[in-house]
Amino acid sequence: MVKKNFIPSVSLVRRDLPTLVTTTTSSTALSKPTSSVVSETSSKSLPSLTSSAFSTSSGATSSSSLIVASITPPSTAGNPFILNAADKPNGTVYIAVGAVIGAIFISILIWWLVSSYLSRRFTMTNSYANDSKNLYRGHHKHSSSLQSNPFDINDEKSYMQDDWDSMSQLESSQYEDAASPFNPIQDPFTDNRRSLFISPTLQVSQYEKSHSRHQSKDTNIFIDDPFLYVGTYLEEEEEEEEERKLNLNRPQRAASPERKEKKINSMEGYHKRNQSSLGLIPVASATSNTSSPKKAHKRQAPSMFLDDVLNGREII
C-alpha cells in the first residue's frame, strides 16, 4: 500500500472591510463632552466602529464687578503736624545728610593742610638755625631774617653759650697737655710716675689751679661781652659754694687734740659725783700708778691661785 502526501483543502471566505459611520449632534444649552461610543454592528459577523463628536455653538457668560476706594492724603493747610513740603525740593533729607558728611571731610582736609604747613615751617626754621649755628659760629651777630620769630632772644643766647663753650674748649686745649676729656682730674706726670703713691688732695689742688688760670684768661679775652661775664661770674660763685661745702682747701686733722681734755673733764665730773679723790690726781700719774701694780703682780697659774684661795691667802 502506497502512502500519498495528504494536502488539506482550505476554503477561503471573502470578508468585507468595516465601514465607518460618523454622527454629529448639536445642542443650544451647555454641552458636555461625550465620549466616542463604539457600537457593534453585525455585517457578516464583522465589527463596526462608530464615533461621534460634539460642537458647541453658544456658551453661558458670567459677569462680576469690584469696588475700589480712592485714597486721598489729608490737607496740609493749617495742620502743624504735617510738614509742608511744597516749598522744598525733592530729596531734602539726602541733601542735608550729604552736606553734613561733606563738611566733615572738608574740615579734616583743612586740618591736615594746616598741620603739614606748620610742621614744614617748623622743620625749616630748625634746619636754618642749625645751619647758621654751624656756619657763623664765633660771631655773635647773626642775620636778622629770624627777628620776626618770638624765639630769637633764646636762640641768640643759645648761640652765645655755644660760642663760649667752643672758645673755652679751644683755650683749654692750648694750655693743657694731652689729657683725656672724660677725666677732669689729670696728673701731668702720669707717664713719668715712679711710685705707686697717689695723692687725691694734690690732684684736686692742681686741677683747681689750672682751672682758675684758664678761667682768668678766658674772662680776660671775653670781658667785653656782658652776658659771658655774668655767666662766668655765676660759675665762679657756684664753684666757691661747692668748695665751701667740701672744704677741700683747708687741711683737716685726723684726731682732735681736745678729746683728752674732754675725757679728763668727764672723769673729773664722774669722780666728783662719786666723791673720790682720783679726779684730783693727774692723768699721767694715775695711769702710771694703775699700771705699776699690774707690772709688779705676776701672772699665776690657775692651780696656784686655787691653792692660795683654799689656804686663805687670796680672797675672791
Swiss-Prot record:
Q: Which domain of life is it from?
A: Eukaryota
Phosphoserine modification sites are S148, S256, S276
Q: Where is this region: Disordered?
A: 32-60, 240-304
Q: Transmembrane ranges?
A: 93-113
GO CC terms in record: cellular bud neck; endoplasmic reticulum; fungal-type vacuole; vacuolar membrane
Residue ranges with Basic and acidic residues bias: 256-271
Q: What is its main location?
A: membrane
The reply to whether Protein biosynthesis figures as a keyword in the UniProt entry is: no
Q: Tell me where in or outside the cell this protein is found.
A: Vacuole membrane
Q: Which InterPro entries match?
A: PRM
Q: Which UniProt keywords apply?
A: Membrane, Phosphoprotein, Transmembrane, Transmembrane helix, Vacuole
Q: How does it sit in the membrane?
A: Single-pass membrane protein
Query: According to its UniProt record, which protein family does this protein belong to?
Result: Belongs to the PRM5 family.
> What PANTHER family does UniProt report for this protein, alphabetically?
CHITIN SYNTHASE 3 COMPLEX PROTEIN CSI2-RELATED
Q: This protein is called what? A: Vacuolar membrane protein YNL058C
List the top taxonomic levels of the source: Eukaryota, Fungi, Dikarya, Ascomycota, Saccharomycotina
